[in-house]
UniProtKB/Swiss-Prot annotation:
Pfam families membership: ABC_tran, NIL
Membrane topology field: Peripheral membrane protein
Organism the protein comes from: Legionella pneumophila (strain Paris)
Gene that this sequence comes from: metN
GO cellular component: plasma membrane
Main location group: membrane
Protein name in the entry: Methionine import ATP-binding protein MetN
Amino acid sequence: MIELCGLKKSFSGKLALNDINLFIQEGEIFGVIGKSGAGKSTLLRCINILEKPDEGEVIIDGQNLMSLSRKNLALARHKIAMIFQHFNLLNSKTVFDNIALPMRIQGIDEELIKQKIEELLPVVELTDKKDAFPSQLSGGQKQRVAIARALSCSPKVLLCDEATSALDPATTDAILSLLKKINELYGITIVLITHEMDVVKRICQRLSVMVDGKIVETTALSNIFNKPESLARKMLYAQISPELPTCLTRRLADYATEKPLVRLFFQGEEATVPFISQTSRELNMDINILLANIDRFDGVTCGVLVVELTANPLLLEAFINRCEQAGITVEVLGYVLPDGL
């Protein structure tokens, strides 16, 4: 559906995109994540040639946008919609007129415009706001208007540039649920860029990680846990892993005692079996659960435990082997000293 081949883009001699190669499948929700300045927004704007790459090809639905005339590029963009962090609504226009704007620019008949808006308003849950002005709407409602406007010309691709970063957590959840519903309802390919892993894990099937203008990793969300060196996996782990309390970290040593502190990451079926109790019985060892969390990523259940073991080095090795056999990732965080030392 979307294929980027050898993209490069510079600003004032500084390379913003460096040899980007990426394929996004039709109908998927694809996330691009990275820190500020990684090149995410530039990449997104190159997909619809709002920023023209210095080198490379942008192929959408079999058509190379880089080779099109200005007129044909404008026509191709009709099928590529975009929403932003800021809603960019016309304050002097009603919700109806804001949604109608792209269709009126294309010269679509007013009766067809009315039909399309009447179709879209229930989808974005704004049926009762048709005649309201932006000043009368909440931030989430404004973004829903922007989404309806983006859908008005029946695009095949929806580009989302930090579309939830200006919203509170509850509204963010609602907008992400709406994007997922739109994907399922219309089969639109959604490309979403963000610096928040929580956004990616909520709705994306696959993701790319960007660092300094390069894509350093592309993976299915459900495969992250099978890649020990995955940067995306480390980002997910950091998000779901509970933070160790100060009262515990100040008692940690890097030399071996018989109280190793271990973090365990579970995935899929391993997250639902009574592994701790079984292992405690099999190895005849005490396992004290200190912290725990469980979450879901693209339908896959994942969990993290921080446990304190009562184990000498040989027993710790047996515990680690038992975890690895069960497909559980193990990280020894340190060794707990007696309180007061």
